[in-house]
Regions:
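Amphipathic hydrophobic-ligand
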Residues: 2-11
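A broad structural signal for short, well-ordered beta-strand segments within beta-sheet-rich domains
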Residues: 6, 23, 63, 123-127
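Extracellularly exposed regions in secreted/surface proteins, prominently low-complexity, repeat-rich
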Residues: 92, 96-139
Length: 139
């Protein structure tokens, strides 16, 4: 099956990044338009994002869970472990994960998301993109 390509926007409430690693939680939503794979036409997909982190202004260290809800009511639960150095001036970050449950379970995920800023709590908004590569069928 061909990959599913999604583009859209992300709105995440963040505790903000500090100079030293700080435990925190975050949550928000993403809105995508997805196509490819087994989708017959471009499809609007909503997701809920939540996670925990121990990040700083120089390093993202987090576990993100994103649950996509497809128009037919099925869901895909995605887990993305993040361990990434923050480059000065970066506006987004590319991460990889796995569909752990639901539609496309076992598939790989590559996601590009807005980079949180160093500073006080804030809403992190910006473009988001995701590619889901479905797992090969078991023979």
């Amino acid at each position: 099956m061909l990959p599913v390509e999604c583009t859209g926007t992300s709105k995440i409430e963040s505790d903000g990044l500090k100079e030293q690693p700080t435990p925190q939680t975050y949550k928000g939503t993403r809105s995508y338009v997805c196509s490819g794979g087994d989708l017959l036409a471009p499809t609007a997909v909503e997701s809920v994002v939540e996670g925990t982190a121990n990040s700083s202004c120089t390093k993202l260290s987090a576990t993100t869970r994103e649950t996509l809800t497809w128009p037919d009511g099925t869901t895909s639960e995605i887990e993305i472990p993040i361990e990434v150095a923050i480059e000065p001036g970066a506006v987004d970050v590319r991460v990889t994960g796995t569909v752990v449950k639901g539609k496309y379970a076992g598939g790989g995920v590559t996601s590009t998301i807005p980079m949180p800023r160093c500073g006080p709590p804030a809403r992190v908004e910006g473009p988001a993109a995701m590619t889901i590569t479905p797992a090969a069928p078991v023979a």
